[in-house]
């Protein structure tokens, strides 16, 4: 199952959370919000999607609306956000 991880290194988690709640992930797949236990301003938004949903999620992330949101996020971050696509390997 493909996984996308969006890594945020924030200046202020509470300010970012307001923006996140206003523009949540798509309703495609299963999404989790993880916060660093050692750095409370590091956040990972993790989405698990079916292979058939990857294109829709990539289209959502690449949409003009989300690019505008990401510009706002980067302005409240200590580093640019990072989008990482992963695929599961059998052990």
Summary of predicted features, one role per range:
Residues 1-91:
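Short S/T/G/P-rich N-terminal loop/turn motif that feeds into the first structured element of a domain
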């Amino acid at each position: 199952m493909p996984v996308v991880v969006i890594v945020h290194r924030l200046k202020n988690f509470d300010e970012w959370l307001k923006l996140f709640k206003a523009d949540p992930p798509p309703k495609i797949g299963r999404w989790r919000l993880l916060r660093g236990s050692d750095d409370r301003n590091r956040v990972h938004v993790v989405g698990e999607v079916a292979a058939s949903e990857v294109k829709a999620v990539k289209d959502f992330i690449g949409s003009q609306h989300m690019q505008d949101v990401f510009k706002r996020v980067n302005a409240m971050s200590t580093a640019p956000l990072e989008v990482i696509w992963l695929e599961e390997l059998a052990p």
